[in-house]
């Protein structure tokens, strides 16, 4: 298979080849840091799920007099789960994209590079959809429970994410459905799609998407405080 490389593809390959060791070291350090962050987020998710399960068990035995109390507690933990799960989706998207970036920055066979390129398209297709959906749930929670909280920056970033997703919908869907997550029934279509993958296009997508999800993480992370306030409204300020 002969890939149709543009002049920019060739230029980027040269630049990457000259700096691949430094790029790889920097990415490895960043990936390790982000993996540690993800582990802390998972603890938060598991904490919420564990307490939701406790509430469910209590509700099975609850009387009509205390059922409302247990439902309120369950609701508070479900709201916290939305926050923590959104942070987890952001972190996982960042880690996955950086993993592919590491491959693209490595001295490996050409077919491995192009396999990573098509994976980038599918990863962005899948994760951007999940993030739009999850941030929608998060916005609904904030508007309902904390209507005075300023979510203007959050809304701006979410709007940018949605626009990015829509602007790149055709190319993301094409690669995902024709040569990666699915395979087109027409072999010529598969070959044509594969041969027209470009390193430059993939890097441009990565740079723009990573910027957006980094900004999204910076506006969602402070909402953990809203989760604490939500729990305090139900349990009081002694609840951890």
Stretches with model-predicted labels:
Residues 161-192:
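Histidine-centered, metal-coordinating catalytic motifs and their short helical/loop contexts
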Residues 1-171, 195-240:
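Amphipathic alpha-helical interface segments
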């Amino acid at each position: 298979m002969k890939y149709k490389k543009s002049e920019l593809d060739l230029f980027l390959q040269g630049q990457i080849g000259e700096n691949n060791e430094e790029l790889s070291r920097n990415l490895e350090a960043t990936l390790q840091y982000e993996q540690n962050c993800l582990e802390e987020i998972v603890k938060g998710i598991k904490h919420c799920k564990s307490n939701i399960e406790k509430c469910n068990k209590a509700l099975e035995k609850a009387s009509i007099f205390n059922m409302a109390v247990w439902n309120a507690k369950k609701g508070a933990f479900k709201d916290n789960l939305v926050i923590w799960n959104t942070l987890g989706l952001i972190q996982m998207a960042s880690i996955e994209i950086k993993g592919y970036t590491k491959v693209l920055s490595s001295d490996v066979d050409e077919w491995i590079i192009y396999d990573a390129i098509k994976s980038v398209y599918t990863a962005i297709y899948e994760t951007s959809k999940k993030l739009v959906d999850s941030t929608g749930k998060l916005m609904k929670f904030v508007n309902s429970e904390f209507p005075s909280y300023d979510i203007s920056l959050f809304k701006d970033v979410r709007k940018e994410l949605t626009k990015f997703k829509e602007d790149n919908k055709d190319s993301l869907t094409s690669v995902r459905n024709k040569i990666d997550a699915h395979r087109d029934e027409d072999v010529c279509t598969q070959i044509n799609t594969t041969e027209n993958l470009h390193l430059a296009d993939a890097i441009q997508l990565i740079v723009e998407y990573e910027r957006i999800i980094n900004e999204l993480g910076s506006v969602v992370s402070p909402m953990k405080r809203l989760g604490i306030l939500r729990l305090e409204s139900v349990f009081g300020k002694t609840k951890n």
